A protein has these predicted regions:
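Residue-level hotspots at or immediately adjacent to binding/recognition sites across diverse folds
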Residues: 2-10, 14-15, 19-343
Length: 343
């Protein structure tokens, strides 16, 4: 499971598709709307029941059966939802009355504070058992990846570089965790995608560049994310059994430093979604089936009047959550649900 987390500045299935089927799959589009005081919504993740979480009007929301619900805060003015499990439990971060941002878990209408006074924290992923991962740090201290499980909080470590920090992004039902670890190596800052397997952190490497980020992990411990290549642009990757492989880009994709292709989510059939820069320099939402990339804008059955720019989640049924970003009338983001249609 899982979602893209904006924690690096550079910047889940019974539906097994073949490459041929991928070209024929079409989707209906549902506009998720916004919370009443906003014209913008960002979407994070979708569970097997089609429940969706994200952020609108600076508040975390849960979208279920066509209704968007404001999840509130921890006493402050801001909250963000980052993940939801198949039981409908939501995690994220929210401001307290004192202004600190704390990790939260929301269930059955109640938001619970996972944070500690004097620290900043965020929850980025949750599995079906309720095990939650994220980051916590005190003022002027680098963040440390955290696992909340069984009512206890545990820091799970980093790569041990000079000035190291780490963030856990996603966790599967086996307790395998994907995230990032940063620090300094040979006098330069480095951010690397990592996975914790049986409690041991593993550096996933890169694709000819220096940096990488893991965004999601599936039931088979396949990790997806992005990695720098030799020209400092970004390439989507999948990592499994010790090997990082580059995912293909759209034909003629125009890349530049810090820009290119990113994989943001994967379901348990290994279908990956994310974004890719097109031949005209626009960013489009994409899907990879058996390693083959398709622009999701070419698969929708009705005109939306918008360009889908990033896919952030995919569930077992193949439903995809996507965003459209525009600068018309100021920068706004709208969120949509794509539902695959039977052939």
């Amino acid at each position: 499971m899982r979602d893209f987390k904006p924690i690096v500045s550079f910047a889940v299935l019974c539906c097994a598709f073949t490459a041929a089927a991928a070209a024929q799959t079409s989707y209906t589009v549902t506009d998720l709307g916004t919370l009443s005081s906003s014209n913008s919504a960002k979407v994070a993740e979708i569970n097997k029941s089609g429940q969706i979480v994200g952020t609108s009007a600076n508040h975390a929301f849960l979208w279920s059966n066509g209704v968007m619900t404001d999840l509130g805060t921890l006493g402050g003015g801001v909250s963000m939802a980052h993940a939801i499990n198949d039981q409908g439990v939501v995690v994220g971060e929210a401001s307290t009355a004192s202004g600190e941002m704390h990790a939260f878990v929301w269930q059955n209408g109640v938001m619970k504070d996972l944070g500690v006074a004097g620290e900043t924290s965020a929850a980025h992923g949750i599995n079906s058992k309720g095990d939650t991962v994220g980051v916590a740090y005190a003022k002027n201290v680098r963040g440390g990846a955290v696992l909340w499980s069984g009512g206890q909080r545990q820091f799970i470590g980093d790569l041990g570089l000079s000035g190291s920090g780490s963030t856990a992004i996603a966790i599967n039902d086996k307790g395998q965790i994907a995230g990032v670890s940063s620090g300094f190596a040979t006098n330069q800052g480095v951010v690397r995608a990592v996975v914790w397997l049986n409690g041991v952190i593993n550096d996933l490497g890169a694709l000819g560049g220096l940096h990488s980020t893991a965004n999601a992990i599936d039931a088979q411990a396949m990790v997806v994310g992005w990695a720098e290549v030799a020209d400092n642009s970004t390439a989507a990757f999948q990592w499994q059994n010790g090997k990082m492989s580059q995912l293909e880009s759209l034909p003629g994709s125009v890349t530049s430093a810090g820009n290119g292709t990113q994989a943001t989510a994967v379901n348990d059939s290994g279908v990956v979604v994310g974004s890719c820069v097109t031949s005209t320099g626009e960013t489009h939402a994409v899907i990879w089936n058996n390693g083959k990339i398709t622009d999701l804008n070419n698969l929708i059955t009705q005109g939306t009047g918008v360009t889908l720019t990033r896919a952030t989640g995919i569930n077992r049924s193949g439903q995809v959550v996507v965003e459209q970003q525009t600068n018309l009338d100021g920068p706004t983001t709208r969120a949509f649900l794509l539902t695959p249609q039977p052939h």
